Regions:
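Residues that scaffold the ATP/ADP-binding catalytic core of kinase and kinase-like folds
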Residues: 12-14, 52, 125
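A general alpha-helix detector
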Residues: 9-10, 48-52, 70, 88
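Short, well-structured N-terminal submotif of metal-dependent ribonuclease cores
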Residues: 1-41, 56-63
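Acidic catalytic patch
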Residues: 40-44, 66-94
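Alpha-helix capping/helix-boundary segments
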Residues: 9, 45, 85, 103-104, ...
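Histidine- and aromatic-rich ligand-binding microenvironments
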Residues: 5-6, 41-42, 97-101, 119-120, ...
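Active-site-proximal, substrate-binding regions of enzyme catalytic domains
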Residues: 50-76
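Acidic, PIN/NYN-like endoribonuclease modules and their adjacent C-terminal/linker elements
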Residues: 105-132
Length: 132
């Protein structure tokens, strides 16, 4: 069976906090892997986790991205191609537009849409139109 992970589960697995709930989340994940289950993480959950790790856990962009990158290579875990493209951008922790913006543009592009934005930095990305 395939399960879509909520942000609350991803954060428990990435941070280990709070310990009791993180232990239960890890046990459920490990039991699922042993049973042959797969787990997917949506772009929205990846974005929420990225911001939450920084805001609530005091980690840097680079640390948040490293945690997500490491998690994405775990057994039975799948992220979207948009996530993979964004997270593997060289120096993504310093990039502008950043990780979430790149995931967004890639997601729209995947369905043939052009991203319409008022952010001038979006001109740096293919598949965008900037209103200015």
């Amino acid at each position: 069976m395939t399960f879509g992970l909520d942000t609350s589960v991803v954060l428990r697995l990435l941070t280990g906090q709070p310990q009791d709930l993180a232990a239960k989340a890890l046990e459920r994940y490990q039991d699922g892997i042993a049973a042959g289950d797969d787990f997917s993480v949506s772009d929205l959950v990846a974005a929420e986790s990225y911001y939450a790790i920084q805001h609530h856990y005091g980690k840097s962009k680079e640390e948040a991205l490293d945690a997500l990158r490491s998690f994405s290579s775990g057994d039975g875990i799948s992220f979207s191609q948009n996530f993979e493209a964004a997270i593997n951008t060289p120096n993504i922790h310093k990039a502008s537009p950043g990780f979430v913006d790149r995931m967004l543009v890639s997601g729209y592009g995947e369905t043939g849409q052009i991203t319409l934005s008022c952010e001038k930095l979006f001109r740096r990305l293919l598949g965008t139109e900037v209103i200015s």
